[in-house]
């Protein structure tokens, strides 16, 4: 039976490249000259932003978003934490969300059932497997999920006939 997987993943190499480009842009920007501001990537899951003030953190957030979009990473996978300020400066943690959570997977399954397509969906950990009798039904399911607006980026893997 034909099937495909619905996943929400971020390419770690592209994420590393985007953070490096954002750091390089900080070095060349006039408003960040002589300022201790930087992005740090931890384990491919958390990006730490640090700067002397919260205003500069907001500017850095715009730089990070632009670099991620330029590298083809959907910014809906980012979860911005609170800006922590003290006398030494300001910091913010940005979490990169990977995988589809149980609640969101149930919403995807409900969306497929609501459309009354001839497909079945199963939740497998942090992915969703969709199976159907015909390839056309699966392509309709992909089109439906692409058109639906979810708060996380979706990719479609393992399309098998």
From Swiss-Prot:
GO cellular component terms listed in the entry, alphabetical order: cytosol
Keywords: Nucleotide-binding
Family according to the record: Belongs to the YajQ family.
Entry keyword annotation includes Nucleotide-binding: yes
InterPro entries for this protein: DUF520, UPF0234-like_C, UPF0234_N, YajQ-like_sf
Keyword Nucleotide-binding: yes
Stated role: Nucleotide-binding protein.
Name of protein: Nucleotide-binding protein XCV3791
GO MF entry, a single one: nucleotide binding
